[in-house]
Amino acid sequence: MALLIIILSMFYLGLMGILLNRLHFLSILLCLELLLISLFIGIATWNTSNSIPQNTTFNLLLLTLSACEASIGLSLMVALSRTHSSDLVASLSLLQY
């Protein structure tokens, strides 16, 4: 029960970090990583508490996807800092018409 509270608080902190910290792109990426880590820990503990050893491949897939997400996010941050010379989210105008 205590682990569930820790996992939910990690997820909540990551979500609040994304909603409240919209100034820098790196802080948004870190909050996304916190969301993924809390999701991974939650799924891993659920699998072990229910004695489901077959879902370890799902855990590895989730870790692989989070590593890909981190590398793509960091490459976007490098491209952003090279073109706009900062990592401010306000300097992004790619989605505006």
Swiss-Prot record:
Subcellular location: Mitochondrion membrane
Membrane topology type: Multi-pass membrane protein
Catalytic class of the enzyme: translocase
Reactions listed under catalytic activity: a ubiquinone + NADH + 5 H(+)(in) = a ubiquinol + NAD(+) + 4 H(+)(out)
Transmembrane segments: 1-21, 23-43, 60-80
Entry annotated with the keyword Metal-binding: no
GO CC annotations, alphabetized: mitochondrial membrane; NADH dehydrogenase complex
Enzyme Commission number(s) from the entry: 7.1.1.2
GO terms for MF: NADH dehydrogenase (ubiquinone) activity
GO biological process, any: ATP synthesis coupled electron transport
InterPro entries: NADH_UbQ_OxRdtase_chain4L/K, NUOK/Mnh_C1-like
Superkingdom as given in the UniProt entry: Eukaryota
Keywords from the named record: Electron transport, Membrane, Mitochondrion, NAD, Respiratory chain, Translocase, Transmembrane, Transmembrane helix, Transport, Ubiquinone
N-terminal signal peptide: none
Pfam families on file: Oxidored_q2
Keyword Secreted: no
Family: Belongs to the complex I subunit 4L family.
Record function comment: Core subunit of the mitochondrial membrane respiratory chain NADH dehydrogenase (Complex I) that is believed to belong to the minimal assembly required for catalysis. Complex I functions in the transfer of electrons from NADH to the respiratory chain. The immediate electron acceptor for the enzyme is believed to be ubiquinone.
Entry protein name: NADH-ubiquinone oxidoreductase chain 4L
Organism (species): Paracentrotus lividus
